[in-house]
Structure formats: structure tokens, C-alpha cells
Amino acid sequence: LARRWKMKKILKGGVIGTLMSNYGLENFLRTEKIKFFRTKVGDRYVKEKMKKFNFNLGGEQSGHIILGKFATTGDGLMVALEVLFSLRKGKKASQLLNVFKPLPQILENIMVKNKNVINKTKCKKAIRKANKLMNGYGRLLIRKSGTEPKIRIMGESYDKNLIFKCIKIIKRSIK
């Protein structure tokens, strides 16, 4: 959508994603010369940042997409209509929907009694160790769930084994 909106001069500014947005998307948008900014996870934060930068396209990896041209909240029906409109123009779904290669991304959700466990020294050391191991070959995101008693660990890298290794280090410090 971002590329099509840019070509039609509908896109205002760029795209807002979240901390969970795949780096493959960010890289694709960069090659298309479309600005991309991240914000906290949640439609509320995406919408706030869209308003702050006067952007009209944003969304979450979960599929919640906000088309600011039409609505101020995510609307799956509206997104489906936009995709169908693009398909009507003669493109195949495979061409339209497979425009970038996502990096392998692994998400682990760990049930905890106390979400503040990630603030403990043992856990902080493990996070530092895992980030050092990642050493520019990917990224890690460790956060408390906003809705459940869980710690969410997301690892992203071209090297899946590296992701598993880093997540394991952090998981051991939490359990």
C-alpha cells in the first residue's frame, strides 16, 4: 500500500510501525525512499505518532493497519478494499503482497508471576550477554506484555540459530 500510495501521491510523509515491525519492511521502505518510524506496540501509539508526524499510513505486525486517509482506527474491511482495488489494476496477489523478504523473527512469550523480573540484575546481565552475542547481526526486543502476565522476547536475524541461542540465554534468566 505504501508504495502504491506514494506513486499516486496519496501517502503523507511515510509509514509508522511498531517496535515489533520486521526489519525487512523497514529495509524495503528505505529502498522505496519512504520514511519509516517505530513506536511502542499498540494501535494507540501508532495513531499518536501518525498524528504527530501528519502521516496517513501506519500499523502493527499483527495486521492492524490504520489508513489515515479514510479512518482514525484500524479497519480490516477498508484495508481489504484497498488491496482488492490494487488487484483490480491487473497485479497478481503474489506480486502485490510479496514485495519484501522478512527477516526470520521468533517471538517467545514467557508466563511470569511478576513482570518486573526483567528489571532484576540476573536478567539484565543475560539481556546484555544476548545483545553482545547478536553484535549487529540482528536485534532483540524484551518487553512486558501490556495485557497478560508475560514477558515477550522477540529475536530477529538472518541467522535463526543465533536468535534461538539469544532467546535461550534470556529465558533461563527469567525462569
Segments and roles (model prediction):
Residues 7-175:
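Phosphate-binding and adjacent anionic-ligand microenvironments
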Residues 1-7:
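Cysteine protease catalytic core and zymogen-processing segment of caspase-like enzymes
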